[in-house]
Amino acid sequence: MTLTKAELADLLFEKVGFNKREAKDMVESFYEEVRIALQNGDGVKLSGFGNFQLRDKPQRPGRNPKTGEEIPITARRVVTFHASQKLKAMVEKNQHGKDNA
C-alpha cells in the first residue's frame, strides 16, 4: 500500500481533528515548503524521519541501448533522501514483526 497526499489529509482529519479543507491545506502547505526549500538549493531535515538533500551530478558519457551510439548525459541536480536511523530502526522492527506473524 502507498500512502497518498489525499490519504494523509484524511488521516489529519480523523486523528487531529482538522476539518477536511484544513487538513488538505496543511498537507499541501507542507509539500510546498519542502519544494520551495529544495528549489532554493536548501536541504530539508525532518528530525526522526530523514533528510532531503541536493546532489550535483557531473556530465558523463552514456550509450543509446538500441544503437550503441555514445551520447553525453548532461550535468544535473538531483534530490536524494536519506532515512534517519530512527526511521530505519522502526521499519526494520516492523518488518521483523511481520515475519514472525
Curated annotation (Swiss-Prot):
<keyword id="KW-0804">Transcription</keyword>
<keyword id="KW-0238">DNA-binding</keyword>
<dbReference type="GO" id="GO:0003677">
    <property type="term" value="F:DNA binding"/>
</dbReference>
<dbReference type="InterPro" id="IPR010992">
    <property type="entry name" value="IHF-like_DNA-bd_dom_sf"/>
</dbReference>
<protein>
    <recommendedName>
        <fullName>Integration host factor subunit alpha</fullName>
    </recommendedName>
</protein>
<dbReference type="GO" id="GO:0006355">
    <property type="term" value="P:regulation of DNA-templated transcription"/>
</dbReference>
<dbReference type="GO" id="GO:0006310">
    <property type="term" value="P:DNA recombination"/>
</dbReference>
<dbReference type="GO" id="GO:0009893">
    <property type="term" value="P:positive regulation of metabolic process"/>
</dbReference>
<dbReference type="GO" id="GO:0030527">
    <property type="term" value="F:structural constituent of chromatin"/>
</dbReference>
<dbReference type="GO" id="GO:0006417">
    <property type="term" value="P:regulation of translation"/>
</dbReference>
<comment type="function">
    <text>This protein is one of the two subunits of integration host factor, a specific DNA-binding protein that functions in genetic recombination as well as in transcriptional and translational control.</text>
</comment>
<feature type="region of interest" description="Disordered">
    <location>
        <begin position="49"/>
        <end position="70"/>
    </location>
</feature>
<dbReference type="InterPro" id="IPR000119">
    <property type="entry name" value="Hist_DNA-bd"/>
</dbReference>
<comment type="similarity">
    <text>Belongs to the bacterial histone-like protein family.</text>
</comment>
<dbReference type="Pfam" id="PF00216">
    <property type="entry name" value="Bac_DNA_binding"/>
</dbReference>
<keyword id="KW-0233">DNA recombination</keyword>
<keyword id="KW-0810">Translation regulation</keyword>
<keyword id="KW-0805">Transcription regulation</keyword>
<dbReference type="GO" id="GO:0005829">
    <property type="term" value="C:cytosol"/>
</dbReference>
<dbReference type="InterPro" id="IPR005684">
    <property type="entry name" value="IHF_alpha"/>
</dbReference>
<dbReference type="InterPro" id="IPR020816">
    <property type="entry name" value="Histone-like_DNA-bd_CS"/>
</dbReference>
<comment type="subunit">
    <text>Heterodimer of an alpha and a beta chain.</text>
</comment>
